[in-house]
Amino acid sequence: MYKILIVEDDETIRNGIKTLLELQGYYVDIAVNGVDGLKKFDETYSLVIMDIIMPLLSGIDACKKLREESSVPILFLTAKSSEIDIMQGFEVGGDDYLVKPFSNMELISRVKALLRRRNVYDREIIDDNAGNEYIDRKD
C-alpha cells in the first residue's frame, strides 16, 4: 500500500485531500506545517504533497531539506501560480506543481503518475543492485 504524507496548514484542504486519497486506497498521514512535515517524514513514504505558504517553514524550505536526504516525489499544491513560483518549485526539487483551486480528478491523476514514476525508479534501483546490465538506447 502506498503511504502519502500531506503537509498543509489549512485544515479543510488537508482533511479533504486525506479523505479523497484514502477513498482511493492510499494510507495517508498529515502534517500541519513544514516543521511538522520534516519531523514526520521517513523513507517509507511513497509521496509527499506539500503546500508552499505555511507558518514556521515554507514548503520551498521544507523541500530543500527533504532533498538533502531523500528522492521521494514531492507534489507542490499551492495558491502560488506565477511562472516564477512554479519555476522555483521545480528548482528546489519538486516533482510536480498543482495550483489551487484544483479538481479532485486532476489531483488523483497527478498522484498516480508520480507513483508510477516512483515505481519505475525503484525497479531500476533494485535491478541495478542485483547486477543486471543495462543497454543505453539512443534513438
Task: Tell where the protein language model's regions lie, with residue ranges.
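C-terminal output helix
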Residues: 82, 102-115
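Two-component/phosphorelay signaling modules centered on CheY-like receiver
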Residues: 11-29
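Conserved acidic carboxylate
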Residues: 8
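Short, Lys/Arg-enriched segments at the junction into DNA-binding effector domains
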Residues: 3, 113-139
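Acidic catalytic/metal-coordinating carboxylates
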Residues: 33-36, 58-62, 85
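Receiver (REC) domain active-site loop signature in two-component systems and cognate sites
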Residues: 52-55, 81
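Acidic, metal-coordinating helix/loop segments flanking the phosphotransfer/catalytic sites
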Residues: 30-47
